[in-house]
Amino acid sequence: MQNNNPCGLDGFAFLEFSGPDRNKLHQQFSEMGFQAVAHHKNQDITLFKQGEIQFIVNAASHCQAEAHASTHGPGACAMGFKVKDAKAAFQHAIAHGGIAFQDAPHANHGLPAIQAIGGSVIYFVDEEHQPFSHEWNITSPEPVVGNGLTAIDHLTHNVYRGNMDKWASFYASIFNFQEIRFFNIKGKMTGLVSRALGSPCGKIKIPLNESKDDLSQIEEFLHEYHGEGIQHIALNTNDIYKTVNGLRKQGVKFLDVPDTYYEMINDRLPWHKEPLNQLHAEKILIDGEADPKDGLLLQIFTENIFGPVFFEIIQRKGNQGFGEGNFQALFEAIERDQVRRGTLKELS
């Protein structure tokens, strides 16, 4: 393995979810275009696929997934990282501060793993080590197109105030993640700081969010989720208009965006060439730099899907940012949603 990529990282392998009601998770993923392609032979564990995305819904009892659901409610209880050599990556992780994780025997993934944020787990996956590799009953071996979601783009972690350096150090010391973006967002009433980390392979991105006050959406998440964890999951598409339209038809609800946002797009990005009426109709956000060479990014955020967790749909047209130009508009949109739900009082 290369020194700059000591664990031989090569992207996301899977995300694992658990919750008090696994039927709701199954229904939600089906509405998003995922298909159940395999079931565990002996446990209540289901594998969903769409494009290259693999979601595992783990409803087994007396295991880490159940414990995570008991603490946090529905959410992402584990993530799998693709690596060149799972055993070597695990050994490197342990030598650099990682804490080994071993699940209950009946729910063992058959993968080396370490403890991660908020009681979650990071599994190491290679060609030899696959999750529950010999325990699946395959029901659908065909590729699943679904709503055109293709891959996991990034996972955003919400952390307690004062813990950003701790988790940045965790990813840096074990995996050699580097800071690739830093944001300081101020809404009308609340604020947050975000530090985006990127893996040496360039395929894993993990922004860390930390609140600047007691009332922000980050603090609301930490309170409702009963701790730190994965706040949102960003999924790639090659045609965001088609994907979002399909998701809306299947009942997925997205954050509203003020009409004034679309009145400003041509001034912000005069070169963009996107169909403005379609952007407006689907409430899709657009971002880019002054120089067209840096490309565009199209994105949209769902409302909270289960608990305080939500999804982002993103299409990258050459831009590798996170929609920094949209953060302010999005932050204020979420503040409006907080006011509507009564968790934040509007300033008079």
UniProtKB/Swiss-Prot annotation:
Classification via NCBIfam families: 4HPPD (TIGR01263)
Cofactor(s), names only, from the UniProt record: Fe cation
Statement: the UniProt record of this protein carries the keyword Metal-binding: yes
Reaction equations catalysed: 3-(4-hydroxyphenyl)pyruvate + O2 = homogentisate + CO2
Cofactor binding mode and count: Binds 1 Fe cation per subunit.
PANTHER family assigned: 4-HYDROXYPHENYLPYRUVATE DIOXYGENASE
Family of the protein in this entry: Belongs to the 4HPPD family.
Protein's UniProt name: 4-hydroxyphenylpyruvate dioxygenase
Gene Ontology biological process terms from the UniProt entry: killing of cells of another organism; tyrosine catabolic process
Annotated residues for binding of Fe cation: 154, 232, 312
Pfam families, A to Z: Glyoxalase (PF00903), Glyoxalase_5 (PF14696)
UniProt source species: Legionella pneumophila subsp. pneumophila (strain Philadelphia 1 / ATCC 33152 / DSM 7513)
Source superkingdom: Bacteria
Keywords: Cytolysis, Dioxygenase, Hemolysis, Iron, Metal-binding, Oxidoreductase, Repeat, Toxin, Virulence
Enzyme Commission code: 1.13.11.27
Domain VOC per the UniProt entry, residue ranges: 11-141, 151-303
Biological role: Catalyzes the transformation of p-hydroxyphenylpyruvate into HGA. Has hemolytic and brown pigment production activity.
Leader peptide range in chain numbering: none
Protein encoded by which gene: lly
UniProt-recorded Gene Ontology molecular function terms: 4-hydroxyphenylpyruvate dioxygenase activity; metal ion binding; toxin activity
